[in-house]
Amino acid sequence: GCNNPKVTVDNSHVRLAEELIRRNVLVLQTGCAAVACAKAGLLVPEAALEKAGPTLREVCEAVGIPPVLHMGSCVDNSRILLAATNILAEGGLGEDISDLPAAGAAPEWMSEKAVAIGHYFVASGLYVVLGHPLYVEGSDNVHDLLCGGLEKITGGRFEWEPDPVLAAEKILDHIERKRDALRINVKRERKL
């Protein structure tokens, strides 16, 4: 996502990422969000030791990666969808991108470019949380389509949440539902 002059610059990006990694979610970012997290020190492997939950910390230490991965400029979000497609193909986690325990977020979006990227994610089947509503609140039909109706078609949908901690909760709830559906929330013997 972008930076938005209507909110404290970088705050939502960093708070959302910190909350997700604290809760053992590997975060992939692009553009301004990635830069915000880099400035906050989250794009170095040592960040996993200080900020990540225990299982994410273990994975990051074993592989030697930070808990937040930089995937390129803001227009490189297709790389994230390509990674999701590869996880789907190689990992056998469902039949469609919409089956994956993954979500998108743009907590400080301000440009139409970010909106277009969000639509690309939703059309690909992902749940996307935006920090403030799209300019569609005047039409119940359009709002209902973007925030629910598309889920019946693509598996993806939008939701708005300005508070980054509450946005993280919504993303985590979505991830847990997808993990339950894939039956990968079952405790198993550790391999690492």
Regions found by a protein language model. Give the residues of each.
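Anaerobic metallocofactor- and corrinoid-dependent redox/one-carbon enzyme cores
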Residues: 1-192
